[in-house]
Amino acid sequence: MTSSAPGNADGQILAERFVSGPHVRAPDKAEHRLNEWLAELEPSLAASLRALLAKGLPRSILLGIAECSPYLFDLVRADARRFERLLRSEPQAHLAELISRTGREVFAATSEADVMRLLRQLKSEAALLIALCDIGGVWPVMQVTAALTDVAVSAVQMALRYLLRQEAVRGRLAPRDADDPEQGCGLFVLAMGKMGAGELNYSSDIDLIVFFDPEVHSLARDIEPQPFFVRVTQALARLLQSRTADGYVFRVDLRLRPDPASTQVAMSTEAALHYYEREGRTWERAAMIKARICAGDVAAGEAMLAELSPFVWRKHLDFQALTDVHDMKRQMQVYRGHSEIAVEGHNVKVGRGGIREIEFFAQTQQLIAGGRHPELRVRPTLQALGVLTASKWITEQARDELTTAYEFLRRVEHRLQMMADEQIHSLPDDAEGVSRFACFFGYESRERFASDLLFHLNIVQGHYARLFEGDPTGTVSLPPVNYGAGPDEPRLMEHLAGLGFRDPVMVAKTLQQWLAGEYRVFRTEATRTSFTEFLPALIDGLAHADEPDRAVVAFDRFLQALQLGGRLISLLGQNRDLVALVALVLGAAPRLGDMLARQPRLMDGLIDPRFFGAMPDKRELSQRLAATLQDAGTYEEFLDRLRLFGQESLFLIGTRILSGTVSAQQAGTAFADVAEGIVHTVHGLVTERFAAQHGRIKGQETAIIAMGRLGAREMTASSDLDLILLYDFDADEPDSDGERSLQGAHYFARFTQRLISAFTSRTNYGVLYDIDMRLRPSGRAGPLASHLDSFAHYQEREAWTWEHMALTRARVISASPAFRARIEEIIQTALRRPRDPVAIARDVADMRRAIAAEKGEADLWDLKHAAGGMVDIDFVAQYLQLVHAATKPEILDVSSLQVLDHAERLGVLPRADAVILRHAARLYHDLTQILRLCVSDKFKPDQAGEDLLRVLARAGDAPDFSALEARLRETQSEVRRVFTSLLEE
């Protein structure tokens, strides 16, 4: 890695202070891009820049940016003189002057448009300067985060001051000082999270909470505080996050306020204090550790924080405080899992060994002891580690190792976000992507970067795990009741009813049976003891399930099925984390719970140490499938083993979704890889068996095309398989050569029926998949299998626009190489033909309206069909492909997310729209994976259990379910706006 100590030669210009830079993988291409840009500039400016870039590191940095960061290279090219000015500046002084000058200009501005332009110019110049200082090693990472925070705080202050001065001009506000209208206005803004701690990351949203004191304000007499301050807050968010030709300043997140789904964006201090006193939760206590007044009436804010202090900092380590801490840890364990740390796809923020664990390590101990030890009440994470060390709560070694890891991981996070100005935290999912990133980060190879990353992740994970050695289970303590007393014990019945069981009599009888040890699994004393020890945690987990009573029944079936499963029960007794995971499976996802109850051997997958490691790729899945099938004696046994393999794969992937250890995209790919492997295997098996009965036709070829979710590699736990079967043969000899000969089309129709039966026939182990072949040419009116020539003719002459939209997801998953190539050429020809954009837009919009009329689009939680839902995003991606593939064939991809990336890169989709659609698609995929796993019918939040709501909130990166719904409404509104602007205006 090209790096050394951060540059600290004060007074030197930036170009002379770089001490590190990217490793450029393709220098010729990067040089070409750089020289093309320089050639476009005015000669004297180009000469000046060439001189500045003559030395190694400045040029290396710019080449790395040109190669890996479209966002930063756009900033460089947008204003070459600004870039030159930055290279010649002393960065610290330049940033301070930039903020100061912008403040003066905003103060003098006379229109909102001018303010928005000035703030966006500030952000763009600061973003480029800070990135150069980070990439070039000029500033250490915490100076980078402080600089980012300074820009954000200054922008909020400037915007709010402008708005308040405008309100004073309108006569709605009577400030004590016209030049300082914040003083005494009653409204104040709390910076939360990393902004509050002065640790903002490069492309971070800013988390703000806006409060106002209704008794202390400078409003005109006839102005009501609530609507006034709500309007000001909405205007503040608009000034900062609306996208204009100059970009945006910061995305603003106001959802950390109390009960965001039902409260206004500006909230009175009285209402907030009442909420925190009555309903405040552990995560809100932890969040308030970092709260800081960043703008507005400082005196009112300080008074509010003083009143809030007892909520955050408890004076006594009472039972409830300890329970809160254990609950925080338990939730992280259950939802994030206990993975073997991976490199590809690893989330450096919330993944194992990541930034969140360091923050949690510090915040947990601050919550425990901060009430009695005021010196622990600090905001920055590294400062918290320092005071915890000084107070003997942690060792110097822990502080030093966690500090080093934190700084490293924050730099990784920044570099990820610099690539496209997106708030991402996960490394690329593939080794090639990680290699590209590693070079941008300054490493020469993926291996060296991976070695350092894994070292730090494992260090963090170790310290985090040791923190709770006093109670490694993190389980809650329940009231002492006799769980084996049966339904005649009033206290037990009251307790079970209080936990939320609808049929406490049934539950009590079941518990009595368990503890009586009558099941075969309890035949040994050791197993009975292990089971008794973890029963309170199990009951607690089931009580918070989506369907608690059903989860108890499922677990009872599971125990009865464990005829020889004493080893598993002993394992559960020794590993409470696994108990929590099983309780989550049985509670939140009844479908998985029923599978586990019917097939206890599925538990073996959870014991496998590879379970929480990297997801198996196609090659490994193929090897596992072959091992599963290798000694199958009969066709029926072969089908049974295929079903077992499919169920085990679904169970393990589903459990990883629930535990939060795989992303929706990884899960969708994994489900698709499993299905693809099974389809290919069944295709080969049925081909051989059918030929044994009916022979073969000369020159015969068959192929299976995946469509829909399988084609897009976006499957869920409940996806069926959308397939098309194509065939070809020698038309001069159409008869098969077997004893029961069949001719041409009839042969392949019977073959297709046999293939479908292999998937859908029900054995003792259920069905493999439901098969849907309605996307074949002519749909239900057409034959089950299509001749290749008929398929080509149909796509060229008869297919409707919607059929070509569906064809964008077509993927040949089982065929000979030569036949595959012929099919892919037909698909490409169909997709790449010139089309009328207006006609296609009209067809797509009409199709969307037809779906809305049939399916409805008003249900927020119909993530596919809702206005602004996944159909809108898929239709945009498909529209862009059909319209532009003729001239830009590289836009084609089966994945909507990839299409959006290509479309942005090719300049046919604005960056702002692409970001909105990508973020929305990822959110919808995350939530859809869980809903398909946990809910068999329409999702109704008011009927859902706490477990499921918590899983959904976690998946949506929201503090609670109400905040998730608020985010979902906002997201769907933004997506529908983009859809309308592209297809209906």
UniProtKB/Swiss-Prot annotation:
Known cofactor(s): Mg(2+)
Gene3D superfamilies to which the protein is assigned, alphabetical: Beta Polymerase, domain 2, Nucleotidyltransferases domain 2
Keywords, sorted A to Z: ATP-binding, Magnesium, Multifunctional enzyme, Nucleotide-binding, Nucleotidyltransferase, Transferase
Cellular component terms per the entry's GO annotation: cytosol
One of the GO BP terms on file: regulation of glutamine family amino acid metabolic process
EC number of the protein: 2.7.7.89, 2.7.7.42
A Pfam family that the UniProt record links to this protein: GlnE
Region (Adenylyl removase): 1-472
InterPro entries, per the entry: GlnE (IPR023057), GlnE_rpt_dom (IPR005190), NT_sf (IPR043519), PII_UdlTrfase/GS_AdlTrfase (IPR013546)
The reaction(s) this protein catalyses: [glutamine synthetase]-O(4)-(5'-adenylyl)-L-tyrosine + phosphate = [glutamine synthetase]-L-tyrosine + ADP; [glutamine synthetase]-L-tyrosine + ATP = [glutamine synthetase]-O(4)-(5'-adenylyl)-L-tyrosine + diphosphate
Top-level class of the enzyme under EC nomenclature: transferase
PANTHER family xrefs: BIFUNCTIONAL GLUTAMINE SYNTHETASE ADENYLYLTRANSFERASE_ADENYLYL-REMOVING ENZYME, GLUTAMINE SYNTHETASE ADENYLYLTRANSFERASE
Function statement: Involved in the regulation of glutamine synthetase GlnA, a key enzyme in the process to assimilate ammonia. When cellular nitrogen levels are high, the C-terminal adenylyl transferase (AT) inactivates GlnA by covalent transfer of an adenylyl group from ATP to specific tyrosine residue of GlnA, thus reducing its activity. Conversely, when nitrogen levels are low, the N-terminal adenylyl removase (AR) activates GlnA by removing the adenylyl group by phosphorolysis, increasing its activity.
Similarity remark: Belongs to the GlnE family.
Name assigned to this protein: Bifunctional glutamine synthetase adenylyltransferase/adenylyl-removing enzyme
Originating organism: Bradyrhizobium sp. (strain BTAi1 / ATCC BAA-1182)
Organismal lineage: Bacteria, Pseudomonadati, Pseudomonadota, Alphaproteobacteria, Hyphomicrobiales
